[in-house]
Amino acid sequence: MYQNSEAGSLGRVVKGSWSDEEDDLLRKCIQKYGEGNWKRVPERAGLNRCRKSCRWRWLNYLKPSIKRGHFNEDEVKFIIQQHKLLGNRWSLIAAKLPGRTINDVKNYCNTHLYKKHSIENIPAPATNTMTHNTSSCVERPESSAAIKEPTWWENILVELQREEKEGKSQNCSGLDFEQDNLGQQDPNINDGMDQWLNSLREVPNLSYQWEENLLDFDVVNLWA
């Protein structure tokens, strides 16, 4: 009360919680002058409160006809119906519910209806989690662009290895050839070398100068 009297002497409006003495002054004013004309209530009641604060205190806390407790089923249906039509205009909705305050209607919608609506709209969690995990771990084949093309020198190595294997097989099978043929040059001895040189000509990245150097080799000495 000391704070309120000091604020009144200085002409300031008091904010914050109401005291018991202020509640009594507001009750007496409403009983004498009735509800309405809230602009003159602070002056008539001798309160350093704004008209909005006086109206809010009376309608939500001090009015004798206020009904406390849980909302029944009919009241809940009515609130839902009116909220679809009026939106968040709580004062209009509460005015149509006898004994219910604006605060009670607003708090009920915020704590019950909105919460229930948000829970119902939450999507159900996925049940087949193993399928999701295994599908994400499946290795994907590499694209055709990522497959490495063999280079020209790799082709040469493969060709040389193949010819080396063919030469070994010919040496193993040549143990039974006639003794008279020793020392004679096989006319087809250079077929493998010709085939190898032809493969080199087909490689686009092989330089022309290097190909001529290969052709200058002594073919007979190379295969001797």
From Swiss-Prot:
Signal peptide: none annotated. GO terms for molecular function: DNA binding. Residues 38-62, 90-113 bind DNA. Residues 10-66, 67-117 form the HTH myb-type domain. InterPro entries: Homeodomain-like_sf, Myb_dom, Myb_TF_plants, SANT/Myb. CDD domains: SANT (cd00167). The keyword Transcription applies. It is found in: Nucleus. GO terms for cellular component: nucleus. PROSITE patterns: HTH_MYB. It holds the Pfam family Myb_DNA-binding. Gene3D superfamilies: Homeodomain-like (1.10.10.60). Induction: This recessive y allele is expressed at low levels, resulting in an inner white flesh of the beet. However, yy plants still can make pigments but never make as much of it or have it in the same location as YY or Yy plants with an inner red flesh. Keywords: Activator, DNA-binding, Nucleus, Repeat, Transcription, Transcription regulation. Its main location: nucleus. Activates DODA1 and CYP76AD1 in the betalain red pigment pathway. This is Transcription factor MYB1.
